[in-house]
Amino acid sequence: ENFSGGCIPGYMRTADGRCKPTY
């Protein structure tokens, strides 16, 4: 489980620490 930002694949870590889709 080496996801960047600790999010699932296809998601990115936002400035407020949440994970949101990149699409």
Swiss-Prot record:
Write out the entry's keywords from A to Z: Cytokine, Disulfide bond
Q: Give the tissue specificity.
A: Hemolymph.
Q: Which InterPro entries match?
A: GBP_PSP (IPR003463)
One cellular component term from this protein's GO annotations in UniProt: extracellular space
Q: Which domain of life is it from?
A: Eukaryota
GO MF terms held by the record:
cytokine activity
Q: Which cysteines in this chain are paired by disulphide bridges?
A: 7-19
Family from the record: Belongs to the GBP/PSP1/paralytic peptide family.
> Its function?
Causes rapid, rigid paralysis when injected into Lepidopteran larvae. The physiological role may be to reduce hemolymph loss following injury and promote wound healing.
Q: What is this protein called?
A: Paralytic peptide 1
- Annotated source species: Heliothis virescens
Give the organism's phylogenetic lineage. Eukaryota, Metazoa, Ecdysozoa, Arthropoda, Hexapoda
